[in-house]
Each structure stands twice: as C-alpha cells, then as structure tokens.
Design a protein with these regions (language model features):
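Secretory targeting signatures
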Residues: 1-40, 248-280
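Non-transmembrane, aqueous-exposed alpha-helical and coiled segments at domain scale
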Residues: 38-78, 86-249
C-alpha cells in the first residue's frame, strides 16, 4: 500500500515538471517570434558603396551636416525606412528651398509611415527625438493615409500601426513653417516588389499565417534590394514628380567651328612654308 502511495506521489510530482517544461517551451517560442519582429534584418548583406550628400541645416547659429550614417547610428542600422526617410527629406528640402540651407526649427515633416526607422530619421533631423543634443526643434508628426494621427510613437505602437503598411504609406510632406510651403514626396510604384508588403506581413507579424522558410529568404532578399535602392538610385527613379535631367547634346556647331579653324590654320601654315621656300 505504501509503495502504491509513493508511486502516486511521484507521478503527481512529475506532472508539474512537465507542465513547467511545456510553458517554458511556449514562452521561448513566443520570445523568438518577438525577436524576429523587433530585429531589423538578421543576416542582411553588407551595405553597398554609396555617396549621398548630407542634409545641411542651421541649429540656431550652428551649421550642421546630417549624414545617412548619422541616422543609421541613431537608429541602430541603415534600414529600408530610414533610407527612404532620409532621401525624402533631402528631396523635399531641395524642392522648397533650392540651394538655401533651412533652419531646424523651420522644418515640419508630416509622415504617413508609422515605422521606427522613419521615425528615428525624422526625429533626428528635426531634433525632436530623445538623446539628441540640439538648440532648436522642428516639428514631426505621423498621420496615416486615412487621417488617423499616431500620437504614441513608441516602437510597440508604431509596429502595431504598421502591420497594414502599403505603398500609400510612403508619402511625406516636407514643409517650411515660416512660409507654409510644402512639398509632398511620393514613392514611385515599382520601388517595392509586388509581393513585398504581403511577405512583410507574414514574416514580421504572422498575418494571415507564419511565413515559410522560403518566404523568409525571399523577403530578406527583397528587403536588401529595396534598402540598396535608397542608397544608390537617383531621385527620379525613386520618387514621383522628379524629372530625369536631360543629357547634354554634343556641341556639333562648336566642334565643326573648331575643325574649320584648324583646317584654315593648317592651310595658312602650308602656304607660309611654301612661300618661304620659293623666296629662298
């Protein structure tokens, strides 16, 4: 009888241990899923070589140059959204001010894109983010395409708002507050592959189901290609309402004139030499 009681006690002791093990495995799986959502792009290939001019602004009476590397350091890496936000700000400022350098507190950016990468870029440029040493501050807002204002800009809330992102979210108003002038920077169709946002939902959020290993690999490749476009492609390949500069036509008239002068010079030289020989 005592042996039977001991067996029952041992079995009952094993049950909680099994339950604990199962719970631990579930928590591990959940934590792994969270890591995959929070991570930028584990194992992404290195950045290509690129040359992008910095964004120059006046912070009070101090002229500062903000490079894409500065944005990457602030955010943690150069990502798709950070690269896009940087290029969009560059373009918007140039469209409104030309070669004039803006004051930081005269810049207002209204973004339709609720992502941590774009947030960190815009906050760094406007001086509105945490941990930025600045004398002045511009203005930065996130307003979704349907008009909803995203007030909480924490990573958690931005990611929640971003699970339905489409190309329509990649629109940014860059404004000069003192004059009210604004230019809306709109990303072109084709910068993202057709299945990019569908794959993003599966990989990052498990919507409508978890991504397969093949889909994860495909999304990683498309993510890398898109990131690299924002580093190396000209504005007219990325954004609407930007005309490709015309190639300079060869100066046919100038070339013909030069050739004619050269021929005349040679004729005169030959005539001069011939006349000297005749005189001697």
């Amino acid at each position: 009888m005592r042996n039977e009681k001991r067996k029952v006690q041992m079995q009952s002791a094993k049950l909680p241990l099994k339950a604990v093990a199962i719970v631990a495995l579930v928590l591990l799986a959940v934590s792994s899923a969270v890591i995959s959502v929070d991570a930028h792009m584990p194992g992404a290939k290195p950045l290509p070589e690129f040359e992008l001019e910095p964004i120059s602004i006046y912070d009070g009476d101090t002229l500062i140059d903000i490079s894409l590397d500065d944005i990457g350091d602030y955010h943690g890496e150069i990502c798709v959204c950070g690269g896009c936000a940087f290029r969009a700000t560059q373009l918007g400022i140039s469209k409104i001010l030309g070669d004039e350098i803006p004051a930081r507190d005269d810049i207002k950016i209204v973004s339709r894109l609720p992502t941590p990468g774009s947030r960190d870029c815009f906050q760094y440029i406007t001086g509105t983010g945490p941990g930025i040493e600045t004398k002045t501050k511009g203005e930065y807002k996130v307003i979704l395409p349907d008009g909803t204002a995203v007030v909480n800009l924490s990573n958690k809330d931005l990611k929640k708002a971003s699970n339905d992102n489409t190309l329509d979210n990649f629109r940014f108003e860059v404004c000069r507050k003192s004059t009210g002038e604004c230019f809306e920077v709109v990303l072109k169709l084709g910068v993202f592959s057709e299945d990019y946002f569908e794959l993003r939902k599966k990989v990052k959020f498990g919507i409508p189901e978890n991504a397969t290993s093949e889909e994860k690999a495909l999304f990683k490749s498309e993510w890398e290609d898109t990131r690299d476009k924002f580093l190396t492609s000209p504005d007219w390949e990325l954004f609407e309402d930007v005309e490709e500069p015309e190639e300079e036509e060869p100066d046919v008239v100038g070339g013909a004139t030069f050739l004619l002068i050269l021929v005349i010079g040679l004729i005169l030289l030959v005539a001069l030499v011939h006349s000297r020989k005749k005189a001697s």
